[in-house]
């Protein structure tokens, strides 16, 4: 499911991609 979500984000707008990356980094840091 993670791969599919990442693929969808990759195809989406750059803004969405940035939000996804920020969320992932936040979870990793948290």
From Swiss-Prot:
Keyword Cell inner membrane found: no
Subcellular location: Mitochondrion inner membrane
Coiled-coil regions listed in the entry: none
Lineage: Eukaryota, Viridiplantae, Streptophyta, Embryophyta, Tracheophyta
Keywords: Membrane, Mitochondrion, Mitochondrion inner membrane, Transmembrane, Transmembrane helix
Transmembrane residue ranges: 15-30
Organism per entry: Solanum tuberosum
Main subcellular location: mitochondrion
Family (UniProt): Belongs to the cytochrome c oxidase subunit 5C family.
Gene Ontology terms: cellular component: mitochondrial inner membrane
Known function: This protein is one of the nuclear-coded polypeptide chains of cytochrome c oxidase, the terminal oxidase in mitochondrial electron transport.
Record keyword Cytoplasm present: no
Annotated protein name in UniProt: Cytochrome c oxidase subunit 5C
